């Protein structure tokens, strides 16, 4: 392809406003590089010329950083810088030859340095913002599917560029910076993040602030969640709201359309240890909500979300076995269920059964389903596990579960989860079956309630038999 001629922008060694020819030539190149055939035939000399213009224009930005009064004179330089970045950005699209040529000219280092200068300026100018965005887009494109370029971008950009841009007020800059981070990360570079946890935390914050942006979400699902070491190190540093965000993404990964792979399972077993330990240690935080009903206690919300994660993990047969034998987990779940059941019956609070729906955002809405999820988790942990079935009985959990079956708008599907738990508690467990049958005979379990749940007690000689009505499907 024939490149438009670009005359020099210096006369007699004195900096002058950018010649209109330079800008027009760059714009022409940018348009040409939208076509694949033009990208594939571009001579290396073009990229050297673009780099020369970029370097010369950078001098004006450096001057403005040293002398803020010069900012008002940046317009022509910013126009050239923006068009240089657009030109280079387009040249890199699905063209490894151009990516390599541009990288080998050390354009990446110049671009990163310039982007960092933009952050230093801290002035509100649309032209500066546009140049900033285009610079990040170029860095993302030059690194896309090119490991050599990714390495160079990482060397120049980590950690300063990510620290500077992930918390930028402009959501497009955050998105483009996240794209660069996503593109450049690999298993080795994850270790760098472990030593710079603030960057990882900034990604969580970016997802919180901009949930519509796919890049922060993809960084967390495709990189962070594949590193149990990073997740564990980061979890202790996160705010409670950030923990809720991370746990929500973990749930999304577990229940997503794509089934967890064998590698995912081994990683999530490590996550399960963190989640279970955190729940066992912190589950009583949820009780703060009984004394401070008007306060959205963030620690309590973390506990609620930890329970949600455990419910989804124990619904996965490959994760279930590990959690069924996790020390202290069943005991804690029964303990919390007993306390909130007692508190809910003794006084009016957010754990009391309700027959009226709550508005979204109310603290009652935040705790919706907590009690029924405790029972769901008990049912999961008892699935084909006699040791846990017996443990629930020993902890007096069976009467507690049966007494929790009242309709409660705060706990949708409560009856279904009670039925599910009772079935798993009694499957191939004659001792638990006898226990419930005797409760019914002694009036401690309502026969009509048991029938509604799909169970009935029959007398055979001097023995009581608990029978299940298989016509009622599990939840």
UniProtKB/Swiss-Prot annotation:
**What UniProt keywords apply to this chain's record, in alphabetical order?**
Cell cycle, Cell division, Cell projection, Cytoplasm, Cytoskeleton, Methylation, Phosphoprotein, Ubl conjugation
What name is this protein filed under?
Ataxin-10
InterPro entries per UniProt: ARM-like (IPR011989), ARM-type_fold (IPR016024), Ataxin-10/CTR86_families (IPR051374), Ataxin-10_domain (IPR019156)
- What is the native source organism of this protein? Rattus norvegicus (Rat)
- What modifications does the entry list under PTM / processing? Polyubiquitinated. Phosphorylation at Ser-12 by AURKB promotes the association of ATXN10 with PLK1. Phosphorylation at Ser-77 and Thr-82 by PLK1 may play a role in the regulation of cytokinesis and may stimulate the proteasome-mediated degradation of ATXN10.
Recorded family membership: Belongs to the ataxin-10 family.
Role this protein plays: May play a role in the regulation of cytokinesis. May play a role in signaling by stimulating protein glycosylation. Induces neuritogenesis by activating the Ras-MAP kinase pathway and is necessary for the survival of cerebellar neurons. Does not appear to play a major role in ciliogenesis.
**Under the GO molecular function aspect, what terms does this record hold?**
enzyme binding; identical protein binding
Tell me where in or outside the cell this protein is found.
Answer: Cytoplasm; Cytoplasm, Perinuclear region; Midbody; Cytoplasm, Cytoskeleton, Cilium basal body
In this chain, where does the modification Phosphothreonine occur?
A: 82
Gene from which this protein is expressed: Atxn10
Q: How does it assemble?
A: Homooligomer. Interacts with GNB2. Interacts with IQCB1. Interacts with OGT.
Pfam families given for it?
Atx10homo_assoc (PF09759)
């Amino acid at each position: 392809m024939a490149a438009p001629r670009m005359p020099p922008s210096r006369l007699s060694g004195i900096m002058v406003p950018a010649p209109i020819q330079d800008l027009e030539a760059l714009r022409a190149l940018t348009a040409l590089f939208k076509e694949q055939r033009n990208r594939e035939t571009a001579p290396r000399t073009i990229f050297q010329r673009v780099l020369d213009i970029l370097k010369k224009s950078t001098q004006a930005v450096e001057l403005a950083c040293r002398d803020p009064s010069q900012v008002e004179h940046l317009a022509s330089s910013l126009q050239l810088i923006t068009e240089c970045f657009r030109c280079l950005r387009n040249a890199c699209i699905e063209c490894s030859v151009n990516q390599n040529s541009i990288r080998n000219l050390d354009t990446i280092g110049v671009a990163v340095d310039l982007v960092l200068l933009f952050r230093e300026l801290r002035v509100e100018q649309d032209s500066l913002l546009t140049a900033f965005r285009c610079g990040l887009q170029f860095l993302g494109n030059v690194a896309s599917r090119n490991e050599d370029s990714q390495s160079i971008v990482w060397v120049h950009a980590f950690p300063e560029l990510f620290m500077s841009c992930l918390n930028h007020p402009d959501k497009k800059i955050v998105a483009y910076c996240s794209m660069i981070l996503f593109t450049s990360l690999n298993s080795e570079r994850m270790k760098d993040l472990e030593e710079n946890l603030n960057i990882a935390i900034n990604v969580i914050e970016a997802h919180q602030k901009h949930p519509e942006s796919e890049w922060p979400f993809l960084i967390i699902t495709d990189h962070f969640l594949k590193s149990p070491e990073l997740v564990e190190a980061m979890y202790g540093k996160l705010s409670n709201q950030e923990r809720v965000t991370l746990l929500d993404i973990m749930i999304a990964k577990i229940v997503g359309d794509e089934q967890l792979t064998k590698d995912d399972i081994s990683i999530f077993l490590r996550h399960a240890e963190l989640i279970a330990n955190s729940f066992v240690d912190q589950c009583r935080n949820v009780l703060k909500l009984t004394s401070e009903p008007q306060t959205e206690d963030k620690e309590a919300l973390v506990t609620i979300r930890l329970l949600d994660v455990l419910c989804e993990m124990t619904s996965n047969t490959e994760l279930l076995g590990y959690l069924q034998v996790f020390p202290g987990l069943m005991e804690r779940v029964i303990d919390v269920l007993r306390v909130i059941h007692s508190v809910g019956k003794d006084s009016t609070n957010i754990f009391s059964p309700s027959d009226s729906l709550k508005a979204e955002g109310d603290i009652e809405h935040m705790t919706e389903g907590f009690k029924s999820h405790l029972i769901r988790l008990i049912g999961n942990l008892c699935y084909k596990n006699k040791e846990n079935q017996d443990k629930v009985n020993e902890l007096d959990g069976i009467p507690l579960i049966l007494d929790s079956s009242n309709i409660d708008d705060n706990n949708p599907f409560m009856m279904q989860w009670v039925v599910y738990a009772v079935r798993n508690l009694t499957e191939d467990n004659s001792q638990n079956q006898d226990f419930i049958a005797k409760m019914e005979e002694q009036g401690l379990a309502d026969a009509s309630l048991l029938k509604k749940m799909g169970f009935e007690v029959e007398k055979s000689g001097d023995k009581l038999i608990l029978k299940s009505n298989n016509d009622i499907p599990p939840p």
